[in-house]
Every structure is written in structure tokens, then in C-alpha cells.
Amino acid sequence: MGDLPLNINIQEPRWDQSTFLGRARHFFTVTDPRNLLLSGEQLEASRNIVQNYRAGVATPGLTEDQLWRAKYVYDSAFHPDTGEKVVLIGRMSAQVPMNMTITGCMLTFYRKTPTVVFWQWVNQSFNAIVNYSNRSGDAPITVQQLGTAYVSATTGAVATALGLKSLTKHLPPLVGRFVPFAAVAAANCINIPLMRQRELQVGIPVTDEAGQRLGHSVTAAKQGIFQVVISRIGMAIPAMAIPPVIMNTLEKKDFLKRRPWLGAPLQVGLVGFCLVFATPLCCALFPQRSSIHVTRLEPELRAQIQAQNPSIDVVYYNKGL
């Protein structure tokens, strides 16, 4: 057995999740695109290190930094509940490169109806893969729920994009560039609640500070879903608001007029730069383990908690991603 102590809690993130900075550092690590370049052997090696450590066996010569690195590599590629390897584009580390490409193309090809429909469909197809790949083991998504959310979000995104596109025909060109963002925001408002409809029906687990389960709350589920929608829309704002303003200016310059083929790669690059920061920072807006005051819970659950322990004022829940 190595010298590394066995009391390091790798079930939790490395950094303090009660602070924004701690959450941001955690998500910068989780969404690191470099994890996509790791080989199957490297992923298996990290899985072995993590599983052995959880079983009480530290790999000889292993340092604490190496343990945490293995933990984050493992978390980036394997489902936390099932232990299955997640499909490559469904991993959190694929968020930046995939969204960079899709969002860049949505912002570039926004003028013609066929390309608007195509890229909104591609975006919602990618979202469906991510949502299915990162589904909760506690509240699994059925194929029917996934299909309903996918069709509804795609329809909502396309309808919003085409509706606003027709309304902006007589407005300044810059306004038209923000149509894809409005479509993405509308799709998030449809997609996420539908994907998590079971939680809205039966509630999500709420616990005391020590993690003891106290019951299920629909109110907590609504708050958690609202926080996730805000985070997802927040992620899109810098990537879909800053590049259009820059590109609207650059496209008037002779440099891009003589080289129009540079427009798409330049737009994708600008989106990627924004997403590298926006994705982890917006994931960190709200604590993963969020809280809600007991007085805001359903009357039955509130009475149940007060009967068990009248001193409990606040309960906790996992908001999801």
C-alpha cells in the first residue's frame, strides 16, 4: 500500500463548493476539452486508480495531485451512477468544442431558412445526446420522455428562429444576428423542464445538512430546474452576443470583404474563446448542492420535517446540470 492516506473524500469536488471561486475551479476542470484527447488506456488507468482508492487500496507511489487528476479524468468519461463510459460527444469535456462549432455555424448561417432549420436541428440533436448521456440514475429518462423533449425543443427553436427572422427583415442587420440566441433560449426553456418532467411530478430528494434524506419536493425541483435554465441561457449569452457585434463590424472592412471564406472560421473561433470561460463560470452560478427554506416547501413535507426535527430551517437538494 502506498503512503497516500485513505481519508481523502474523492466523492466530492476538490474545491469548496460553497464559494463561486471553488465551483468555478471545479467546472474549469470538469469541462477541460483536453480530456477528449485521452486514450482508452489512460481512461482505464484513471478508473482503476479511483475504484481501488474507494475500495481502500492506494496505488503505490500515488500522490494526492495524481489522485485528484485521476478522479476528474474518471468523472469526465464515465457515468457516475452506471459506471458506463459516456459516448464521446456526450461528455462534459466535449461541451466547448461541440458548442463552439454548432453555435459558430448558427451565427454564420442565419440568413437562409434551410440553414436556420438545419443548424437548430443539429443543436437540439446534440442537446438530446448530452441530456441522455448525463441522465440521472435516480430519475432515469425514458425513450418517450427523451423523444418528446427532443421534438418539442427542436420545434420551439425552429419556430422561434423563423418567426423572429421574418420580423427582423426590415430592422438593422445586427438585430438579425441575435435571432439564433433567442431560439436557443426558447429551446432551453422547453427542453430542460420536459427532460426533467418526472421530477416535476414526484419531486426530487431533499436532505438535511448531514445528507439524511427527508422526503421529495416538487418545489425544490422547480427551483433547481429554474437555476439550470438560467445557467444554460447564461452560457449562451457571451458566445451568441459578443461575436455577432464583432463580426458585424469586421464584415464591413475590406479585409473580410476580400476574404469572405474567413467569416465562418473566425466566427467559430470567437465563439470558442467565449465558451471556454462562459461554460464553467455559468455552471458555477449556483451551488450543485442548493438549499431552500423549509417554509417554502409543500405543506405536507413541511409538516413531516417539523415533526421529525423542528430545528431544521433549511434543506438541501441536487439541482442537476
From Swiss-Prot:
<dbReference type="GO" id="GO:0140300">
    <property type="term" value="P:serine import into mitochondrion"/>
</dbReference>
<dbReference type="GO" id="GO:0006730">
    <property type="term" value="P:one-carbon metabolic process"/>
</dbReference>
<dbReference type="GO" id="GO:0005739">
    <property type="term" value="C:mitochondrion"/>
</dbReference>
<comment type="similarity">
    <text>Belongs to the sideroflexin family.</text>
</comment>
<keyword id="KW-0029">Amino-acid transport</keyword>
<keyword id="KW-0496">Mitochondrion</keyword>
<dbReference type="Pfam" id="PF03820">
    <property type="entry name" value="SFXNs"/>
</dbReference>
<comment type="function">
    <text>Mitochondrial serine transporter that mediates transport of serine into mitochondria, an important step of the one-carbon metabolism pathway. Mitochondrial serine is converted to glycine and formate, which then exits to the cytosol where it is used to generate the charged folates that serve as one-carbon donors.</text>
</comment>
<protein>
    <recommendedName>
        <fullName>Sideroflexin-3</fullName>
    </recommendedName>
</protein>
<feature type="transmembrane region" description="Helical">
    <location>
        <begin position="146"/>
        <end position="164"/>
    </location>
</feature>
<feature type="transmembrane region" description="Helical">
    <location>
        <begin position="225"/>
        <end position="245"/>
    </location>
</feature>
<keyword id="KW-0813">Transport</keyword>
<dbReference type="InterPro" id="IPR004686">
    <property type="entry name" value="Mtc"/>
</dbReference>
<keyword id="KW-0554">One-carbon metabolism</keyword>
<dbReference type="GO" id="GO:0015075">
    <property type="term" value="F:monoatomic ion transmembrane transporter activity"/>
</dbReference>
<keyword id="KW-1133">Transmembrane helix</keyword>
<dbReference type="GO" id="GO:1990542">
    <property type="term" value="P:mitochondrial transmembrane transport"/>
</dbReference>
<keyword id="KW-0472">Membrane</keyword>
<feature type="modified residue" description="N-acetylmethionine">
    <location>
        <position position="1"/>
    </location>
</feature>
<feature type="transmembrane region" description="Helical">
    <location>
        <begin position="266"/>
        <end position="286"/>
    </location>
</feature>
<dbReference type="GO" id="GO:0015194">
    <property type="term" value="F:L-serine transmembrane transporter activity"/>
</dbReference>
<keyword id="KW-0007">Acetylation</keyword>
<keyword id="KW-0812">Transmembrane</keyword>
<dbReference type="GO" id="GO:0031966">
    <property type="term" value="C:mitochondrial membrane"/>
</dbReference>
<feature type="transmembrane region" description="Helical">
    <location>
        <begin position="174"/>
        <end position="194"/>
    </location>
</feature>
